[in-house]
Regions:
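Conserved beta-strand/loop elements of the cytosolic catalytic core of P-type E1-E2 ATPases, chiefly
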Residues: 3-24, 29-44, 59-68, 81-90, ...
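A short acidic Gly-Thr/Ser loop motif
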Residues: 40, 112-113
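Membrane-embedded transport module
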Residues: 53, 57-108, 112, 122, ...
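Cytosolic ligand/metal-binding cores
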Residues: 119
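Conserved actuator
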Residues: 39-52, 128
Length: 184
């Protein structure tokens, strides 16, 4: 019976990836940013997207595997893994909290309701303008044009400003120390 069937159509479903994402990931990696993907999608889908944007091939860790770990073992797995799949909003939040607890400066980019707990947990929550309103409401930064390509530029500017503040503070403290020394 199957031999008598004739195919009528072929349907292919794939995620559209933003055109600037591969170059943005390359710039972030060049700046020393450790990129992690935390997704609720199927592991093969997440790995495929990571490969298409130029992230190094890495094993995928599922929530079911993470749930079996606790304490230092959980923290070590989170630190060593770059791609997480089949994660719930609560696990996304737990992963972000673990990284922050380990002393990492954690920035989270999300656009959906399921990202809200993790966005709130991150030190810098970033939402896409075309994402869910609640994600934008809880984020520290909203990318108005919904493009990640502005992040490497923001990182460069932030580091430049921080360096200038450091130099100014050092100069100010030196001047004050010399004034106190002159008075004494």
């Amino acid at each position: 019976r199957i031999a008598s069937l004739e195919p009528l159509a072929l349907v292919v479903i794939h995620d559209e990836i933003r055109t600037d994402l591969a170059s943005t990931m390359g710039e972030l990696l060049a700046h020393g940013v450790e990129v992690k993907i935390i997704s609720g999608d199927h592991p093969q889908t997440v790995r495929g997207v990571a490969t298409r944007v130029g992230l190094p091939a890495a094993p995928v860790l599922l929530e079911s595997e993470l749930a079996q770990l606790s304490g230092p073992a959980f923290d070590q797995a989170v630190r060593a893994t770059a791609i997480f799949a089949r994660t719930t909003p609560a696990m996304k939040r737990h992963i972000i909290a673990s990284l922050a607890h380990q002393g990492q400066y954690v920035a989270m980019v999300g656009d959906g309701i399921n990202d809200v707990p993790a966005l709130k947990e991150a030190r810098l929550g970033t939402a896409m303008n075309d994402g869910a309103q609640i994600a934008k409401d809880v984020s520290d930064l909203v990318l108005l044009q919904s493009t990640l390509s502005t992040l490497p530029h923001a990182l460069t500017e932030g580091r430049s400003i921080t360096q200038k503040i450091y130099v100014s503070a050092r100069l100010y403290l030196s001047r004050n120390a010399m004034t106190v020394l002159a008075i004494v």
